[in-house]
Amino acid sequence: KIAIQDASPKNVDLEFRKSLFKLIAGDLRVSSHFRVEDEYLQSSYEGGPIENFLSDKKVDLILRFSATQDLNSASANVKLINARTGTTTSERSYVLNDKKRYPFLAHKIVSEANDQIGAPSIKWMEQSVLFARYTEAKKSEIVLSDYTLTYQKVMVTGGLNIFPKWGNEEQSAFYYTSYNGAEPT
């Protein structure tokens, strides 16, 4: 069983912190490698005897994050703590240059925590999803998203744009079919 503790500074937007908590908890559940303590727990980043063991919650691991954001970026320091011994088993820092993409921060944190315990890979969570969304008759847009659809960015508008497909493994290019007249292009 794993507990998630928010150790973010109090001046960081509470809605952002709780949203990150929910994404991390959801990702841990989706992985099916963890039983997740549902309670939103807060702690200092260093923790103390109570926060580092959580004996009343009967957990084996604690994932503690301290998230910050500024005008453009979002970052998090993360510790994975063995709740039986109170020792930190791993500690990492993550930075995203576009804070709107913060769901990918949660996905990366969970993917690496999953790797730390030696469970089968869930790296697919870190990848982007590309899909077509109809907006009205003969109109659609191509949207880039995370797998939870929490983050969405419209990439192509105008006309009927369908069948998006990644053009490479790095997900830096994509193809799609566009019906802007009688013929597909």
Model-derived segments and their meaning:
Residues P49-I109:
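Amphipathic beta-strand/beta-sheet edge segments enriched in Tyr/Trp
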Residues A3-D6, L23, D27, R35-E37, ...:
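Soluble periplasmic/extracytoplasmic beta-strand elements of cell-envelope proteins
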Residues L23-F34, K57, K108, E112-P120:
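Structured segments of extracytoplasmic/periplasmic soluble domains
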Residues K1-N52:
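Short beta-strand->alpha-helix linker/helix-N-cap micro-motif
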